Amino acid sequence: MGLPIVAIVGRPNVGKSTLVNRLTGMMDAIVHDSPGVTRDRTYRPALWNGRDFSLVDTGGLVFDDQTEFLPFIRQQVMIALAEATVVVMVVDGQAGPTPADHEIAHWLRQQDTPVLLAVNKCESPEQGITQAAQFWELSLDEPLPVSGIHGNGTGDLLDQVVEYFSETPESEDEPEIKVALVGRPNVGKSSLLNAFVGENRSIVSPISGTTRDTIDMVVRRGEQTYRFIDTAGIRRKKNVSYGPEFFGINRAFKAIRRSQVVLFVIDALDGVTEQDQKLAGRIIDDGRACVLVVNKWDAVTKDTYTINEFSKQIRSRLNFMEWAEMIFVSAQTGQRVEKILNLVDTAARQFEQRVTTSVINEVLEEAVSWHTPPTTRQGRQGKIYYGTQVSSQPPTIALFVNNPDHFKDNYRRYIERQFRENLDFTGTPIRLLWRGKKLRDVERNTANRATRA
């Protein structure tokens, strides 16, 4: 069994995301002064009185409207309710009870899950008692005055929440691979996530920009656990207004940094765009392992040579990511989706790989014997004394040389290729740090190591 789940529900714009941010101590949920900002159900880790649990922020619940995303949001709320240990209904203490609140309360009373009532926006403790008293008419549990902004009353709310948990908390820390799903809007990231999870976890819609929160979902396959981060689509900044989508894009960049492996989703119909190239550069700058996922492959008219032609086109546009493995899939039909996790496993393993100094220097000696370092116009030849891995995630190797300026880009790329071919750094960037060092310092360090041995 997993952690207890607490579902946060309520009509639009009552401050659910603000309250979730307060209860979890995080600033992940997008908060913006317009209704309907949260669309998917979003999971946040929380801790109170030594009990770990998950808070689920859901979209604003409206029953009598079929426009845009509202039917999808209702479906998400119902799924959250089905898996929750306890539900917290959030209402607006400043607005007072509304017909929508009554409708939601009536629906919740018909469910089997226990319900707590949080009266939000009670910024003054004195006025909060009066504001909360109005909500007895909803015929739920005692109305609890809280303030998502200032934190008033949140401790009392959490005290009641944890009372619904079982007496045997699970505190096992499972190793997991953190995977970020990134790409331009409407390339099929949420459809891929749903294919992995096996349910409509994220709102899937042909309207560009549907997902605006980063959404975490844990998936288990065999003994391996994966934490998928479904991010907002990334588009050119000049095409993004200052609002929820702006914040979602910035959080997508944070999701890349938070991940170990990035599933970079590309639309097979559009190919690699200029924005895709910039996003690829972002992944490399952040030093993350990567798998290129070419989605919507079912929509492409194919013959015997199609996949090779597409591969060449994509590789030529992303020639600086030649180390990333590529797979052609269809989230719609499920074609090859399961194989993505095999590539994730490989990329994550190589991302964390550590190689002994002796093996690194064997590769260097072989590389130099086949292709000696260049000589400058002044007759000075570059010399590589030795190399050693200084960190992983991504693998980073320091090369100690007589003068880094003697080694131009073409020779540096050659050395990187030798490491990749001999040490199998598939799916991960590697960083080479070229460090100047005088020969006598190298000899002294070598002698010191020999003496200690």
UniProtKB/Swiss-Prot annotation:
Residues 4-169, 177-352 form the EngA-type G domain. Associates with the 50S ribosomal subunit. This is GTPase Der. Residues 353-438 form the KH-like domain. GTPase that plays an essential role in the late steps of ribosome biogenesis. The lineage of its organism: Bacteria, Bacillati, Cyanobacteriota, Cyanophyceae, Acaryochloridales. GTP 2 binds at residues 183-190, 230-234, 295-298. It comes from Acaryochloris marina (strain MBIC 11017). The gene is der. PANTHER family: GTPASE DER. Gene3D superfamilies: 3.30.300.20, P-loop containing nucleotide triphosphate hydrolases. GTP 1 binds at residues 10-17, 57-61, 120-123. It comes from the Bacteria. GO terms for biological process: ribosome biogenesis. PROSITE patterns: G_ENGA. CDD domains: EngA1 (cd01894), EngA2 (cd01895). GO terms for molecular function: ATP hydrolysis activity; GTP binding; ribosome binding. The keyword GTP-binding applies.
